[in-house]
A protein has these predicted regions:
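Short, compositionally biased
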Residues: 1-166
Length: 166
């Protein structure tokens, strides 16, 4: 196992329905005990435009859950001499409510599997995450788009569905 304080893990024993925290996750309380870890506590709800720009974060003036901005938003620092027009958003701009997920690295260690005709079933496994690169860890694929590495990924904040009344 790992002893690094910045590697967080869990061992899942599916047969016995047992979950055991590992490495830096040991002795942490559920929820707030993980807030200081960027992969978990660094998540932020935001409004993302159709072209992938963050217009506002939850708690900021202008944040909206209506599907469009209800007021103009200027993300330029106050007093900026030459404001970046890409950081200005007009009221009515179409946005989605997303969760900004900071990048993280992961490692999966299967401990017990059962062979089946078509593949295998995992019975016991260890999952590890780290905010920083570690030997044997991989950057989660959500942070690689068209071969380019990104510092954040945007995930849906709400479940979605399609409905047709016809």
């Amino acid at each position: 196992g790992y002893t690094d304080g910045d590697i967080y893990g869990v061992e899942v024993d599916f047969e016995n329905k047992k979950f055991t925290r590992l490495a830096g996750a040991v002795n942490r309380s559920a929820g707030s005990g993980f807030d200081g870890i960027n992969a978990f506590g660094g998540r932020k709800r935001c409004n993302l435009t159709n072209d992938g720009r963050v217009a506002a974060y939850y708690g900021e003036a202008g944040f909206s859950t209506t599907g469009k901005l209800t007021q103009a938003v200027d993300r330029n620092p106050v007093g900026t001499e030459s404001p970046d027009e890409n950081l200005k958003f007009s009221a009515g701009t179409i946005v989605q409510v997303m969760v900004e997920q900071p990048k993280f690295y992961y490692k999966v260690v299967p401990l017990k599997t059962e062979k089946r005709t078509k593949g295998a079933i995992t019975r016991k496994i260890r999952y590890y995450v780290s905010d920083t690169p570690k030997a044997g860890f991989k950057l989660h694929p959500a942070f690689i788009v068209n071969g380019q590495e990104h510092d954040v990924a945007y995930l849906a904040a709400f479940e979605g569905s399609l409905w047709d009344a016809s």
